[in-house]
């Protein structure tokens, strides 16, 4: 009964009734046995299959992770080897370039030294030729000048002595 929104309980649902408790328990046990016979096996096997599937997925994930770590380790090793190889190639290239540069510089220096030596030798030869020409001209001028001064003819030995003396005087004055 309902009076002003409150339920009056006179031997209703909340009072314990031993017969109701007995039959409820018996019904529960019977339903439990039926469920155990019919549904428990499939439920347990489904749960076990699910557990096996999950465990299999976990195992595959661990295996994939281990394989990925192994591949990563190998890649790092390969990268380290490639870095070392590239460093070696760069170092060898630099050494080769340095040797090549040094060889070219050495060859250029040798070529320049050879050219300078040849130029000096050529200059020295030209200097000797010019001095020889100059000596001859000076000797001739000196002889002509001496002949005019003394108005007499000199013999060849005397001319040679006078010319040699003048050349030596000129050489000592120049140096």
From Swiss-Prot:
The chain crosses the membrane at residues 14-34. It is found in: Cell inner membrane. It comes from the Bacteria. GO terms for cellular component: plasma membrane; proton-transporting ATP synthase complex. The keyword Membrane applies. Keywords: ATP synthesis, Cell inner membrane, Cell membrane, CF(0), Hydrogen ion transport, Ion transport, Membrane, Transmembrane, Transmembrane helix, Transport. The keyword Ribonucleoprotein does not apply. Its main location: membrane. One of its GO terms (molecular function) is proton-transporting ATP synthase activity, rotational mechanism. CDD domains: ATP-synt_Fo_b (cd06503). It is a single-pass membrane protein. InterPro entries: ATP_synth_B-like_membr_sf (IPR028987), ATP_synth_b/b'su_bac/chlpt (IPR002146), ATP_synth_F0_bsu_bac (IPR005864), ATP_synthase_B_chain (IPR050059). Belongs to the ATPase B chain family. F-type ATPases have 2 components, F(1) - the catalytic core - and F(0) - the membrane proton channel. F(1) has five subunits: alpha(3), beta(3), gamma(1), delta(1), epsilon(1). F(0) has four main subunits: a(1), b(2) and c(10-14). The alpha and beta chains form an alternating ring which encloses part of the gamma chain. F(1) is attached to F(0) by a central stalk formed by the gamma and epsilon chains, while a peripheral stalk is formed by the delta and b chains. F(1)F(0) ATP synthase produces ATP from ADP in the presence of a proton or sodium gradient. F-type ATPases consist of two structural domains, F(1) containing the extramembraneous catalytic core and F(0) containing the membrane proton channel, linked together by a central stalk and a peripheral stalk. During catalysis, ATP synthesis in the catalytic domain of F(1) is coupled via a rotary mechanism of the central stalk subunits to proton translocation. This is ATP synthase subunit b. The gene is atpF.
């Amino acid at each position: 009964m309902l009076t002003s929104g409150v339920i009056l309980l006179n031997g209703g649902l909340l009072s314990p009734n031993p017969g109701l408790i007995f039959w409820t328990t018996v019904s529960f046990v019977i339903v439990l046995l039926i469920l155990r016979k019919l549904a428990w096996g499939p439920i347990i096997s489904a749960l076990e299959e699910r557990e096996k599937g999950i465990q299999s997925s976990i195992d595959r994930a661990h295996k994939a992770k281990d394989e990925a770590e192994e591949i990563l380790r190998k890649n790092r090793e390969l990268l380290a080897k490639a870095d070392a190889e590239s460093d070696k190639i760069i170092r060898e290239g630099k050494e080769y370039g340095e040797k090549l540069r040094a060889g070219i510089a050495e060859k250029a220096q040798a070529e320049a030294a050879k050219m300078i030596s040849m130029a000096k030798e050529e200059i020295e030869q030209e200097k000797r030729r010019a001095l020889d020409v100059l000596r001859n001209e000076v000797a001739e001028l000196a002889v002509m000048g001496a002949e005019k001064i003394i108005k007499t003819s000199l013999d060849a030995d005397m001319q040679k002595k006078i010319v040699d003396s003048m050349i030596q005087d000129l050489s000592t004055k120049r140096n």
